[in-house]
Regions:
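Signal peptide processing junction and immediate N-terminal pro/mature segment
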Residues: 20-28
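Active-site rim elements
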Residues: 44-47, 103, 165-169, 238-247
Length: 281
């Protein structure tokens, strides 16, 4: 009887160890919960329907990735719109990416501009949409600025200097080969504004060009900013609500967010855990 017990005990222990190993292995195989990316959308100012676009962008972008978008909105429709979120010393703390969609062309205070840019210089990625390219301008911004000059800082962050646009007409968009555009189909917008580009800074990579009549220029691009090589992605497309709500536009912008945060594969697909949890409508 003792011999049988001695034989059964090791077998039972072996079975228990196997069960423990299997349970541990199964637990290890379960994917860890991935926290959503946190984005801050700064939006408001002159010349656009930002009251509607803030909600269009939040809904459309959150639908396309494991992403939470907080909104810092100013109802001020002037070119001197200011934003309460910028009043905090560490205003970007806790966010993985800042989406700039403000149109504050006549905010020229260098202290304010420095506070806005400091998080990006420290490594917080940036995504810039349409009117952001025409914000924080001073001096003779109609001419190419000099690198390092007081009126160059915002343009250096953007990676490109734009000063104006023509009348609204459809823009034919053609993509370049890049992870942020992989798999995206060329398309034509409704009536939109084609921004001019009077200076493209070294290191800026063209992602898309837009053609409107006989004029063709860069409409989406990316670069690395400052000593930290912060990833910054931008597009000048996005004036009208219909364009902002267009699936092709939202697909482009979400690529910029994922690329800038390092959550985009070379095939243009989100990194594991950052794909949308439900099918895009």
């Amino acid at each position: 009887m003792k011999a049988k017990l001695l034989l059964i005990l090791p077998i039972a222990l072996l079975g228990l160890a196997g069960a423990t190993f299997m349970a541990t292995g199964q637990d290890a195989a379960k994917p860890a919960t991935v926290k959503p990316l946190r984005a801050l959308l700064v939006i408001g100012g002159c010349c656009h329907d930002y009251a509607a676009q803030k909600d269009i962008l939040k809904a459309g972008l959150e639908e396309r990735a494991n992403l939470t978008v907080d909104i810092c909105y100013s109802p001020d429709k002037s070119t001197k719109a200011t934003f309460t979120c910028y009043e905090k010393e560490n205003w970007a703390e806790g966010y993985d990416v800042i989406i700039h969609n403000e149109c504050s062309a006549d905010i020229t205070d260098p202290t304010v501009i420095k506070r806005i840019l400091d998080p990006h210089l420290s490594g917080t990625p940036g995504v810039n949409l349409h009117g952001a390219m025409h914000s924080y301008r001073s001096g003779n911004y109609g001419k190419p600025v000099t690198a390092g000059a007081g009126n160059a800082h915002w343009f250096e962050y953007i990676g490109l200097q734009s000063t104006s646009h023509g009348k609204q007409l459809p823009i034919s968009i053609t993509y370049s080969a890049h992870a942020a555009t992989a798999g995206l189909e060329n398309w034509t917008t409704i009536n939109e504004e084609l921004y001019n580009n009077i200076q493209i800074f070294p290191g800026t990579e063209t992602l898309a060009k837009g053609k409107q009549g006989d004029s063709e220029t860069v409409v989406a691009w990316a670069h690395e900013y400052g000593d930290k090589k912060t990833k910054v992605w931008s597009t000048t497309i996005g004036h009208n609500n219909e364009t902002t709500a267009d699936a092709k536009y939202l697909d482009l912008v979400i690529r910029g967010i994922l690329w800038s945060t390092g959550k985009l594969g070379a095939d243009g697909k989100p990194a594991p855990g950052y794909a949308p949890t439900a099918a895009v409508k």
